[in-house]
Regions:
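Glycine/threonine-rich beta-strand-loop-alpha-helix active-site module
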Residues: 58-117
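ATP/NTP phosphate-donor binding region
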Residues: 1-80
């Protein structure tokens, strides 16, 4: 079992040959986590999708917004969605990825304890 998160992500991304990569963040993980994650993971090309933070935003309207943004960026079945955030973000991001075009691959990168369980 690997313990280096960043090398595991880099290995997964390079082995699957994704057509496009999307990173889902909220305003907090956009400000405090995204830059560090990008530098350490070595991801070069990606599209960023931002949603509002908070439990109130775990709803179908947020999911539709994610689907709309994936669609506008021309996401396809070989796209990858990386969910960088806490429990709300990983929940809604996982659901959105699982239901977009009958499911695209996603990786959860939890930033809170709740996001890890």
């Amino acid at each position: 079992m690997k313990t280096d998160l960043y090398s595991s992500i880099t290995e997964k991304i390079s082995s699957d040959k994704f057509s496009s990569i999307f990173i889902l963040v909220d305003e907090n993980t956009d400000q405090f986590c995204l830059e560090i994650f990008i530098k350490k993971s070595g991801i070069k090309l990606f599209n960023k999708i931002i949603i509002a933070s908070g439990e109130d935003n775990k709803n179908i309207d947020t999911c539709v917004s994610i689907w709309d943004q994936l669609n506008s960026y021309k996401a396809d079945r070989k796209s990858l969605l990386i969910n960088l955030g806490g429990g709300v973000l990983t929940d809604i991001g996982g659901f959105a990825a699982s239901t977009y075009l009958r499911g695209i691959k996603f990786i959860n990168i939890p930033t809170t304890l709740l996001g890890m369980v």
